[in-house]
Amino acid sequence: MVAVIIKGNEVAEKKRAQLTEEVVKLKEQGIVPGLAVILVGEDPASRSYVKGKEKGCEQVGIYSELIELPETITEERLLAEIDRLNGDDRINGILVQLPLPKHIEEKAIIERISPEKDVDGFHPISVGRMMTGQDTFLPCTPHGIVELVKETNLDISGKHVVVIGRSNIVGKPVGQLFLNENATVTYCHSKTQNMKELSKLADILIVAVGRPKMITADYIKEGAVVIDVGVNRLETGKLCGDVDFDNVLDVAGYITPVPKGVGPMTITMLLHNTVESAKRAGVVCK
């Protein structure tokens, strides 16, 4: 049996086409979704991510605003910029590109963003609402992962989901989202003693650890859905995931590739959250 490849780029394009239609309808009502992205410093990777977000906004018809600030900016000045955007009716979503310079406390910055504009889903209020199953902006990568699993038409309810990794950005929230879908969830991490045995119990395996090709066929239950969140660059310059794709291909039922797997879904869910925020605000642009 060879696994079915879940092509995240194709799923993302399909969802972006749906978002484009929604944005057209909103604009007919005088509502223009708007996303502001704050970029501090000149980190090339961050700039590349921001460019992808701008391109996504342009594709679906979202107004985007890039605020570029020097690496030397004070925390107070950055907080003031967020306050300005919180009060700007043209802006439905605010995203601060991480990481930030060491002299700025990320927690304080994230908490300053209005929960109504927290399209990244990182604000403590958003996290609390997610934990209790309330309507909120879901974190983009975890939300994208759940959407990819749903593409397999597998009934998530009652399935055993194993999450390898416990970061605040992916591991912890993705487990909670699957719990909200009535799955049974097990977390594995660096201190887990029997990771291989646990991962072999997974109907759905989510891997987000940042270690190239760590997960091999002997970690996989036959027919499992395998979602590889890792993006690692080998010495050859080639990108690979945390899962040894070729090794696992004959055991898994479904698998995401790297690249063109989870990555394209992250920005797509950010666009989704921005459109949802615009719908909730319902502010007609003059």
Curated annotation (Swiss-Prot):
Which GO terms are recorded in the biological process aspect for this UniProt protein?
A: L-histidine biosynthetic process; methionine biosynthetic process; purine nucleotide biosynthetic process; tetrahydrofolate interconversion
NCBIfam families, A to Z: PRK10792.1, PRK14186.1
Q: Which residues bind NADP(+)?
A: 165-167, 190, 231
Cite the EC number. Answer: 1.5.1.5, 3.5.4.9
Organism encoding this protein: Bacillus cereus (strain ATCC 14579 / DSM 31 / CCUG 7414 / JCM 2152 / NBRC 15305 / NCIMB 9373 / NCTC 2599 / NRRL B-3711)
User: What is the protein's quaternary organization?
Assistant: Homodimer.
Bilayer-spanning residue ranges: none
Q: Which GO terms describe its cellular component?
A: cytosol
- From the UniProt record, which GO molecular function terms apply? methenyltetrahydrofolate cyclohydrolase activity; methylenetetrahydrofolate dehydrogenase (NADP+) activity
Q: Which domain of life is it from?
A: Bacteria
Report which gene this protein is encoded by.
Answer: folD
Per the record, the pathway is: One-carbon metabolism; tetrahydrofolate interconversion
The record's function comment reads:
Catalyzes the oxidation of 5,10-methylenetetrahydrofolate to 5,10-methenyltetrahydrofolate and then the hydrolysis of 5,10-methenyltetrahydrofolate to 10-formyltetrahydrofolate.
Q: What is stated as this protein's family in its record? A: Belongs to the tetrahydrofolate dehydrogenase/cyclohydrolase family.
| Protein name listed in UniProt | Bifunctional protein FolD
Q: Which reaction does it catalyse?
A: (6R)-5,10-methylene-5,6,7,8-tetrahydrofolate + NADP(+) = (6R)-5,10-methenyltetrahydrofolate + NADPH; (6R)-5,10-methenyltetrahydrofolate + H2O = (6R)-10-formyltetrahydrofolate + H(+)
Return the InterPro entries for the record: Aminoacid_DH-like_N_sf, NAD(P)-bd_dom_sf, THF_DH/CycHdrlase, THF_DH/CycHdrlase_cat_dom, THF_DH/CycHdrlase_CS, THF_DH/CycHdrlase_NAD-bd_dom
Q: Which UniProt keywords apply?
A: Amino-acid biosynthesis, Histidine biosynthesis, Hydrolase, Methionine biosynthesis, Multifunctional enzyme, NADP, One-carbon metabolism, Oxidoreductase, Purine biosynthesis
- The reply to whether NADP figures as a keyword in the UniProt entry is yes
What are the disulfide bonds? none
